[in-house]
């Protein structure tokens, strides 16, 4: 590359080339700093994307790692995945557990889901379910569907129930299963159960009270006419 002597660019001893002029025009990237207004705010500075909602766990499948929560205000069933639960170790929810969360649309377009799920106080850890699936840690307890107890055995090898009869794992009775257990209904629908019990008591009281037969009415009317 040819070089030329440029006045003001050298002290007479150093030669100056066009390449030097190009380098002089390049910005000084090292000294370039973002101003305060140009900095991207951190996550802590960002406002919450949506309001914080509150609800309770409707059910949660600990084996598959997902379930649903019921929103307190709308009563909507919101999908929840274990990856969105604020807890350490095995992540799950207990049935009826109180939670708070944010809501967003699901990526597959099938309704909405709860995320950043924690206790009623934001950031508070969750209790989770006592039921754990059998995995590498065989000592983890799970609920047997035959005896209703938390143990390390499965229902097909239950040592506590020798017959083929199933046991309600809600109350332990052999007369019914958990799906129709009155204790389960009383726990989750107390107002409806109380109304049904009150109606049954009223009908029982009517049946036990003495009633006046048609013959008694005719006899009473006959006595009144004779007088």
From Swiss-Prot:
Pfam family, one: CSD
Amino acids binding Zn(2+) 1: 144, 147, 153, 158
Effect of substituting residue 31 to A: Loss of ced-3-mediated cleavage in vitro. Partially prevents reduction of lin-28 protein levels in vivo. About 20 percent of mutants fail to reach adulthood. Defects in alae morphology
Compositionally biased region (Polar residues): 1-17
Subcellular location: Cytoplasm
Matching InterPro entries: CSD, CSP_DNA-bd, Lin-28_RNA-binding, NA-bd_OB-fold, Znf_CCHC, Znf_CCHC_sf
Zinc finger (CCHC-type): 143-160, 166-183
Expression induction or repression: Negatively regulated by the miRNA lin-4 which causes degradation of the mRNA encoding this protein. This requires a lin-4 complementary element (LCE) in the 3'-UTR of the mRNA encoding this protein. Also negatively regulated independent of lin-4 and this is counteracted by the action of lin-14. Positively regulated by TGF-beta signaling.
Residues covered by the CSD domain: 52-120
GO biological process: cell fate specification; negative regulation of gene expression; negative regulation of primary miRNA processing; nematode larval development; neuron maturation; pre-miRNA processing; regulation of cell fate specification; regulation of development, heterochronic
MF (Gene Ontology): enzyme binding; mRNA 3'-UTR binding; mRNA binding; mRNA CDS binding; pre-miRNA binding; primary miRNA binding; zinc ion binding
Region of interest (Disordered), ranges: 1-27, 181-227
First and last residue of the signal peptide: none
Cross-referenced SMART domains: CSP (SM00357), ZnF_C2HC (SM00343)
Protein name per Swiss-Prot or TrEMBL: Protein lin-28
Lineage of the species this protein comes from: Eukaryota, Metazoa, Ecdysozoa, Nematoda, Chromadorea
């Amino acid at each position: 590359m040819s070089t030329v002597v440029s006045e003001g660019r050298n002290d007479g001893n150093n030669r100056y080339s066009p390449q030097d002029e190009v380098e002089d025009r390049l910005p000084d990237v090292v000294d370039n700093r973002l101003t305060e207004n140009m900095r991207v705010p951190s996550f802590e500075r960002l406002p919450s994307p949506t309001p914080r909602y509150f609800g309770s766990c409707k059910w949660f499948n600990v084996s598959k790692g997902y379930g649903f929560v019921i929103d307190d205000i709308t009563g909507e069933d919101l999908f929840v995945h274990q990856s969105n639960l604020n807890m350490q170790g095995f992540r799950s929810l207990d049935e009826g557990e109180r939670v708070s969360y944010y809501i967003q649309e699901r990526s597959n377009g099938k309704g909405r889901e709860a995320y950043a799920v924690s206790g009623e106080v934001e950031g508070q850890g969750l209790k989770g379910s006592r039921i754990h699936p059998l995995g590498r840690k065989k000592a983890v307890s799970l609920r047997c569907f035959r005896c209703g107890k938390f143990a390390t055995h499965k229902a097909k090898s239950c040592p506590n129930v020798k017959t083929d009869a199933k046991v309600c794992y809600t109350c332990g009775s052999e007369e019914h299963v958990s799906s129709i257990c009155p204790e389960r209904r009383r726990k989750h629908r107390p107002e409806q159960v109380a109304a049904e019990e009150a109606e049954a008591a009223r009908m029982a009281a009517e049946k036990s009270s003495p009633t006046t037969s048609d013959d008694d009415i005719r006899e009473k009317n006959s006595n009144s006419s004779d007088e």
